[in-house]
Amino acid sequence: MKTKRILASLMMSMTTIGLWAQVDVHSHAITASYMDFVKAHGAEMDEGFPIPEWNVEDHLAFMDQAGIETAVLTMPAPQPWFGDGAESAAFCRKYNEECAALKARYPGRFLFCAALPLPDVKRAVEEAVYALDVLHADGVKLATNSYGQYLGDPELEPLMEVLNSRNAVIITHPHKPSAVNDKLIAEVPLASYEYLAETTRAILNMVAHDVLVRYPDLKVVVPHCGSFLPNALPRFKGLLPVMIKQGYMKPVDVDANIARLYFDLAGAATDDAVRSLLTITTADHLLYGSDYPYVAAPALVAAKGSLQQRLPALGLDPQAVLSDNARRLFGAAVPIREYGEKLVRLAEIEVVPEKLEAYLKYASEVGRISMATEPGVIALFSMQDKTDPCKIYILEVYADQQAYQAHIQTAHFRTYKEGTADMVRSLKLIDTVPLVMAEFVKKAR
């Protein structure tokens, strides 16, 4: 029984994760022009946390290391509005055109959701139309509040109408509330707690104004594992009848509004956080998000690998969370990866019976690390002979010969090879010529 459990772990850890293009819906493009604009207004510490450095080469390197095919770019905080609507609109136009250029320069690697010069609603509508219709933005990014103007505010109705008419994706992101004690920010950065409250506040304000029911073609993404919504929603629903009776609110269909939301798993996507999130949404509305570059790339790669390994135990399909749900949300904007010829081989391994459990542990670990950290390792799929459990077959798919050579030189592969040297009775490697790789990959999706 123990051997079967270890084998199940091995199968899960070595399952194919590279056959489908993974999508990161939560990342930020911190362009030089953005930093210059923010610094010119003395706002680089406006959110109580330093704005990290960013460049496209490092972003792509992180994506390759993490196995991410496509990232959705958005503007970070703070919102580029400092009292002059025309200035803000001009900068948002410049920023959106820069993001559109990145999308064009690296086809398939980047999408972008446009920045809008809120709280100037008229100019925001104009920029939304230009970004979506001319630049072919993949959606818009809206701050939870723009200097006190919260999502759900009736002032935003003209913008919601325009976005709804274009079936727009809205990426929401927390920003500093207008009335915040500066001393409090200095001691405990907003991102550690207030961002979660801020997101919850904004989404519940949208629900209270029935925005998502009245504009059913909007697709709104909530960041950071739903923030405090799983905890706040039961209280909100419980108080709603009283609020309606007292005339503070109008009747709204809370569940219908919440059902239209999508949720990214950026931040601390612990098992408990994901389980809590699933009390208010469904598996097909969960999306992967990194929050790059606000977290160091090595930490993000490790966290993504951990999440990917834990999803099945939570009853979730890694392919759906990391790829399919985002592909459905953004439609044709997310490219289908094209595959040429790959290096494909089959390993036939006979393991010493009394060392089978130890071998499977080694194999599980090398599979987990390889799939999480090596973009050139497309698939490591293990199988056990039904009649002889000591016979293990591993289907290996590599991007090319170079990827295979790089794989066998890694520290984790060497640990596996040296640690199992006395566990293997025989090893046979069969190199193959893939005849229908493209068709296989399409079917595997």
Residue ranges and their predicted role:
Residues 8-18:
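Bacterial N-terminal signal peptides
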Residues 3-5, 25, 29-70, 97-104, ...:
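Mid-to-C-terminal alpha-helical segments outside catalytic/metal-binding sites
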Residues 29, 118, 174-178, 293-295, ...:
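Short glycine-enriched loops at secondary-structure junctions
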Residues 23-27, 71-73, 111-114, 140-142, ...:
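Hydrophobic faces of well-ordered beta-strands that scaffold small-molecule active sites
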Residues 335-392, 397-414, 425-445:
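Short S/T/G/P-rich N-terminal loop/turn motif that feeds into the first structured element of a domain
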Residues 69, 75-203:
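Active-site gating/metal-coordination segments in enzymes
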Residues 207-210, 216-256:
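Aromatic-lined glycan-binding groove of carbohydrate-active enzymes
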Residues 31-54, 89, 178-199, 236-260:
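Active-site gating loops and adjacent loop-to-helix segments of metal-dependent hydrolytic enzymes
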